[in-house]
Amino acid sequence: MRIDVVTLNPRIIESASEEGILKQALKKGLLELFVHQLRDYARDKHKTVDDRPYGGGPGMVLKCEPIFEAVEAIGWCKDKDTVVCPSPSGIKFDQQLAKDLSKRNRLIFICGQYEGIDQRVIDQLVDLEICIGDYILSSGTIAALVIIDSVVRLIPGVLGNQDSILDESFEDFLLEGPQYTRPRKFRDWEVPAVLLSGDHRRILLWRKRLSEEKTEKMRKDLWEARKKGERI
């Protein structure tokens, strides 16, 4: 997979690529990651990328020209590439959407800043606006990194143990159940006996039951979707 990120904050992505999942994917040759400083595509000597909004209002809006220049300069192909813009106006990001994106050949992220992006960019370039949650971030680049991390770990071969993906939260609309490791007893708290029984069927049923109980208690939206067989 190839991922391009057009941003005013390239170090957010670059520093993340030096650690964890992104580093593994790059090292294994399963990911190509290119980060593009938006200011490099501004035409004027001041490298201006934003301006006041028409009609008035607070803040500044990212301009069309540098964004179009950037996306076109990196070889954007409208019919093959998926252009993503993290945005409060977007569809809700979830595990199923992460899976869908992990199967794409190339993702191009346009990261907003300030009061947002000129709507003509959204209308003409963007295929998918994605919202990672109902809260405000200082930069769309942070949201893009969340999406990228979630997507890249689903690329076959990135994780050392692909089976671990099947046991994670949100698979089959369930939160992952409790996990324990050594020591067997810490202070007055012991590991549940069933996990020490060696009976794999009992352990599987126990984990499923606690996973269901946790989901019903903590995420009623997931629980209801599971019962209905719907996508969150």
Swiss-Prot record:
Gene3D superfamilies attached to this UniProt entry: 3.40.1280.10, tRNA(m1g37)methyltransferase, domain 2 (1.10.1270.20)
Subcellular location: Cytoplasm
Reaction catalysed by this enzyme: guanosine(37) in tRNA + S-adenosyl-L-methionine = N(1)-methylguanosine(37) in tRNA + S-adenosyl-L-homocysteine + H(+)
SUPFAM superfamilies: alpha/beta knot
GO MF terms, alphabetically ordered: tRNA (guanine(37)-N1)-methyltransferase activity
One biological process term in Gene Ontology: tRNA N1-guanine methylation
Keywords for this protein: Cytoplasm, Methyltransferase, S-adenosyl-L-methionine, Transferase, tRNA processing
Enzyme Commission (EC) number: 2.1.1.228
GO cellular component assignments: cytosol
Keyword Membrane: no
CDD domains: TrmD-like
Residue sites binding S-adenosyl-L-methionine per the record: G112, I132, G133, D134, Y135, I136, L137
Pfam families linked: tRNA_m1G_MT
Top-level taxon of origin: Bacteria
Chief location category: cytoplasm
Quaternary assembly: Homodimer.
Matching HAMAP family: TrmD
Function: Specifically methylates guanosine-37 in various tRNAs.
Family classification: Belongs to the RNA methyltransferase TrmD family.
UniProt name for this protein: tRNA (guanine-N(1)-)-methyltransferase
Organism, as annotated: Methylacidiphilum infernorum (isolate V4)
